[in-house]
Amino acid sequence: MFKWAQAALANVAGTKEPIYGPEAIRSVAEEAKTTPYTETTKDDLKWQAMESTCVETQCFYFMTDSGQLAFAQVIYSNVAGIRTTCQFNCKVFSLDGSKPHLWCSTPLNNHEFSEDKTSFYATDCAVELSEDGNSYTIKSLNDERSIVNVTIKRTAPGFKIGTSGTTLFGTDLANPWGSMRHVFWPRCVAEGTIATPDGPVDCKGRAMFVHALQGMKPHHAAAKWNFCNFQGPNYSAVLMQYTTPPSYGSTVVNVGGIVKDNEIIFAGAEGAVTHVAIKGDTENDWPEPTAIKFEWKGTTKDGKQADAVLEGELEDKLDRIDVMAEVPGFVKQIVAGAVGTKPYIYQYAPQKKKLTLKLKLGEEEISEEGYLFSEATFISA
């Protein structure tokens, strides 16, 4: 009970959590031992909209046929059950560095959900799941610099790892005090536009969607993150890795998979991420990576051992985000007061040389070049 009270205090006051140890986390990898993944249904896409501390997001990544990169994101956040805030973010990257990235982050008013919780609405904003559960339409008029009207349709099944997609946190895991959940649509097609001051961005091309829920303070759940979104002509690969703070035993959790049109090749919790080379960031002491290796392991539906590797130079980072300087005030409230917390996100999309996804499915070997969008996030040491 005392530890639960400490956790409750840490959630409200931003104090540092005590050391609970690895026994205070049940990784989704435990579920994945017997059920590596489950294909998503419409129910999996419902907003949880928790009434306790949480950050819940739906994020849509666009890799356009014309070679542009962008994302749109809705964030729902609750601080200690006291205040709920929603935000719409849109970013259009300047891949050649000739101009600043377009970054628009707008607080939303009058948010609500559809009756079945699968669609989100606010003033001048709508993120709607179609009746058949296979496509989303994202519309935002909240910032005249980025007027979004895009539809994505999945071309492969979505998945969650294990049966729930969820890692639980707490000393009594039957009554957890925290959670982390991810649901993916790794391979989609997009159409529509983002109207910007430099003209419309035609989003026709590939897309990826992830619905994430951190049912606790973000810096309590993870000390660092790695994210891979790879899109090739025939294959898509996604990997999300997070490492908990020492309070939960610095536990590493990997969730990801490889898909092609109409089929999940394999998915599970046996991935790995290695920062093959780092140069370090002189401004904040974080070990900024310059080369990376993503790995996936699993079993195909017909029982073949499956492995995949994506490795290469990250080239110059696209962006470095000082989270505390850029995130909305409500997220700062969640992180405020946390000792040793200085979150930075490093974003990459190698342009000079495409990376190659190397698949081994049983005896069959497949290599495919494609486009990578990757993030390395450092929150606390």
Swiss-Prot record:
Provide one Gene Ontology biological process annotation.
response to oxidative stress
Q: Which InterPro entries match?
A: Ceramide-binding_SVF1, Svf1-like_C, Svf1-like_N
GO MF terms here are: ceramide binding
The way this protein sits in the membrane is described as:
Peripheral membrane protein
| Segments for region (Peripherally associates with membranes) | 1-18
Under SUPFAM superfamilies, the record lists:
AttH-like (SSF159245)
Superkingdom of the source species: Eukaryota
GO cellular component labels? cis-Golgi network membrane; cytoplasm; endoplasmic reticulum membrane; nucleus
Give UniProt keywords alphabetically: Cytoplasm, Endoplasmic reticulum, Golgi apparatus, Lipid transport, Membrane, Nucleus, Transport
TM helices/strands, residue ranges: none
Q: Quote the subcellular location field of this record.
A: Golgi apparatus, cis-Golgi network membrane; Endoplasmic reticulum membrane; Cytoplasm; Nucleus
Family membership:
Belongs to the SVF1 family.
Annotated function? Ceramide-binding protein that may transfer ceramides from the endoplasmic reticulum membrane to the cis-Golgi network membrane, and is thereby required for the biosynthesis of complex sphingolipids.
Q: What is this protein called?
A: Ceramide-binding protein svf-1
Tell me what gene encodes this.
Answer: svf-1
